[in-house]
Structure formats: C-alpha cells, structure tokens
Amino acid sequence: DLHLLHRIQNAGCRSREDVVFALQKIVDTIVQESCGITLIGGDVSSNFSLFDLFVKLLAHSAYGSQTFLFVLGNHEFWEFPDLSVEHITDKYRKLLEEHGMYLLQNDLFYKNEFDDMGIIPYAELEQMTNAELTERLRCSRLVVFGGTGFSGCNVEFNANNGIYWNTVDRETEIQESKKFDNLYQKLLPVLDQKNTVIFTHTPQKDWSSNPKSHAKFVYVSGHTHRNVFYDDGEERIYADNQIGY
C-alpha cells in the first residue's frame, strides 16, 4: 500500500520534476532495504501513468539485481471502468514484464535450487493435476501463490462501498474471490510440502470462506491500513508494511 498519490500530495509536489524526485526517494528506500525477492502488494497508485513511472524508476535503480513480485490492489482498477478484470490485469502485466518484473493474479511464482524462477499461470494451474504440479515444483525452494484476492467474503467493506470505484461490481468481486479461494484450496496439498507464501492485497478473511491460516504458510497482505504482524510459529501473518498513509 504505497499510495503514491498521497505521498506526492504530502510532499507538496508542484511539477513533474518534483514528482520524479519524490518517487525516486521512495524507490531508493525500497532498493536499499530489499534483497533477493521484494513483494509489492497493490495500491501503488490509482493513476496508471504514475504506476508506470514508479516501475521505470524502480527498474532503473535496481539494475536487475532484485526480483519484484506485484499483485494489484483495488486502487489499480479505478482508472479503467470500461475494462474487465482480465484486460486490466493484462495491461499491468505487460508493463511489468517489459521491466523484468512479475505480476501475480491467481498465479504461482517459483524459485528453484538452481535460482531458476518463473510463473505458472492460472489457466495452467487450473488444468494441472496435483501430481503434475508436485513434479513441476520438485526442485523449488520457494513458491508464492498470489493475486488481488478481492473482498468477496467481506460483507461490510466491499465493491458496494466503491473500493474499485466503478470498475468491479459486487457480483464480479465475489466471483474473483471464489476463483482465488478455489485454486488455493486445490493447491493446499502440494504447497504444504514447500516454503510457501500466500501473497494477496486483501487479507485472507476477505477472500476465503474458511479463513484458517495454514501452519506452514506465510500470509502477506495489505489493504486494511492497519499494520499487523503475528508469528507464533504456527500462524504467520505479515501485514505490517502498509506505508502509504
């Protein structure tokens, strides 16, 4: 939850140069404090041009030395009321891939013991048997299953409150959460054997009809603007880096 528009407003930016300067400071902090794999969990900006600028600055500053995984937040959908979730996702994915970064939308990222890495997309995950996926991930050291998650299971704060502006309605939101949750449930027996991160914009209770944390997984999310960190060795919830406000 970087919320760059708020950061720019708070910095008193009056020109493009001011904006670039403000974003570069944020990017420098991210690069300096990151190593290996960095998760950027949505609500970067509701303005696509600003998102684009941020990604370009990040790619230039990181020099390809780090791996960046993104998921979309509800704010990333605001600017595209005439596009479907799939088309919006493709738009962001194309931008990120141009700069060597990854977008997860019901997809699985893996990194194996030889430091090879890649994405298994939703369409492929849906068709694979668990035996096939187990073989595919045989050498993986880390897997990240990620997506927006949406808020289909949150009856109090959801699309009816305008959290996607006019782009995603309640029916679509519920369908998208079911899509993610159903795949999550299918993958559980395979991911149980791996070092697994469940990476979503919204917390598990918003997208899952049975929001019970798996003892071996780390759950990373944002959206709430209330930082939470909990790790008792059995339940691991890392939602403590929401820094945009």
Task: Give the positions of each predicted feature.
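Active-site metal-binding loops of divalent metal-dependent hydrolases
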Residues: D1-L4, G42-S45, N74-E76, D107-L108, ...
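Active-site-proximal loop/helix segment associated with metal-binding centers of metalloenzymes
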Residues: H6, I120-V197
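Metal-dependent catalytic neighborhoods of phosphoester/phosphodiester hydrolases
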Residues: Q9-N10, G42-H60, H75-H99, L108-E124, ...
